[in-house]
Regions:
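Cytochrome P450
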Residues: 1-424
Length: 424
């Protein structure tokens, strides 16, 4: 049961909030920032009960890793902090059909993870991404053309931020334009399952809605894959269904799971980074002016700073495979830890004045694309390119554009903006 802002307990100490309570994630951002600052100041990571979900068994609880150093070490040691035992994208252990369907490689360890990543990674190398540069550039131009035609006051998220990654991912896979809206709607359901706008008011049917959205996306790519097997083109689906690396290729189930991962991760996270980017520029006119003074020269630093503060994915979960001491804390075999990237990207031990948006910042690295190691975001190069091009086009043609009244996604997993009015 949700509570009103007036009923929420003020955050004075680490005992005043619960990361497993969905209402914590609906608090204002400054309260969330203060809460994680308190957690980073504790002698050892805080331990929490697990969220209660009807379709998952009750769990033993988890440690919240909120310091940059802890998240880097856990990410670099997948043999100790594994992803495949119950899944990485949810804190409770998920049924196998969920981890296979909605996480694909994210919810796997080696050797399965290495095999799948080896097959699909060829499409996401810097060399391959360079082949899409002209498409990204042209799409951004058309999006700003449409924005100017619609005029001030439209929804920046749906009219700008969501359009670019959706088009690029669908084009890469060979999904026809008539299905863009279908893909967009289903990905919203998968990542916004608890948000009332996407049907989340009926908690009892969340699992059914998630599975149905996954089944529909899976069927879309299975039909396309079957056609591309007989009639291959230059798109990514053709490459995946016909890929043969050391005698291996994707199974039909693996193709479906990877597609779901791609459209969800590739669309939702990049669109939220772009949305937060405009909000940050609106709140920090000095940084807008600085970026405008050298749009191309300041773009790399600005994009990294946007991703750091946006932190589109709040967390991933790991399970400890053997007793292990990390930075003074002993973790026992079978215990769960949750890697809060959002918190690590605001760690005072790494980032000077961490809440400040500073496009010249040099400290890091941030973990907005996940921590270092085998699960680092496969599409990071593409995401950086999309964010760079979108803001280059906006700053050149609509330099005074602002984002106001953002509506946040009701989610503990995704740090998302659903809607935001743009004014220019």
């Amino acid at each position: 049961m949700s509570v009103t802002p007036a009923e929420r307990r003020p955050i004075v100490s680490a005992d005043d909030f619960d990361l497993s309570d969905y209402d914590f994630w609906a608090r204002p951002m400054h309260e969330r920032e203060h809460a994680f600052q308190l957690l980073r100041g504790l002698e050892r990571p805080a331990f929490y009960r697990e969220p209660e979900i009807d379709f998952a068994p009750p769990g033993p609880g988890y440690y919240a890793l909120v310091r940059h150093a802890d998240i880097l070490e856990a990410s670099r040691n997948p043999e100790v902090f594994c992803s495949g035992d119950g899944g990485a994208t949810n804190i409770p252990d998920m049924p196998p059909e969920f981890t296979e369907y909605f996480g694909s490689m994210i919810n796997m360890d080696d050797p399965r993870h290495a095999r799948l990543r080896r097959i699909v990674s060829r499409a996401f190398t810097p060399k391959m991404i360079k082949q899409f540069e002209a498409d990204v550039d042209a799409a951004a131009v058309r999006i700003v053309d449409d924005l100017l035609a619609k005029g001030s006051g439209c929804d920046f998220v749906t009219e700008v931020a969501a359009k670019l990654p959706l088009k690029i991912i669908c084009d890469m896979m060979g999904i026809p334009e008539k299905d863009y809206g279908f893909v967009f709607d289903r990905s919203n359901v998968i990542l916004g399952g608890f948000d009332p706008e996407y049907g989340g008011s009926d908690v009892s049917s969340i699992a059914e809605r998630l599975l149905m959205a996954g089944l529909e996306l899976n069927q879309l790519v299975q039909d396309l894959g079957a056609h591309r097997t007989e009639h291959p083109t230059s798109d990514l689906t053709s490459s995946l269904v016909n890929a043969n690396i050391d005698g291996e290729r994707l199974t039909a189930q693996e193709l479906g799971s990877f597609f779901i991962l791609l459209v969800v991760a590739g669309n939702e996270t990049t669109r939220n980074a772009i949305s937060y980017g405009l909000r940050l520029l609106t709140q920090n006119p000095d940084q807008r002016a600085l970026w405008l003074s050298d749009i191309d020269g300041h773009a790399p630093g600005a994009v990294e700073e946007i991703v750091r503060l946006a932190s589109p994915v709040n967390y991933m979960r790991r399970k400890v495979t053997r007793d292990h001491e990390m930075n003074g804390t002993l973790y026992r075999k079978g215990e769960k830890v949750v890697l809060y990237y959002w918190a690590a990207n605001r760690d005072e031990a790494v980032f000077t004045d961490p809440l400040r948006f500073d496009i010249l910042r040099t400290e890091g690295p941030h973990v907005g694309f996940g921590g270092p190691g085998p699960h680092f975001c496969l599409g990071a190069h593409l995401a950086r390119r999309e964010i760079t091009v979108m803001f280059r086009e906006l700053l050149r043609r609509v330099p005074g554009i602002e984002g106001h009244r953002p509506e946040r996604l009701y989610s503990s997993f995704i740090n998302g903006i659903k809607h935001m009015e743009c004014v220019f």
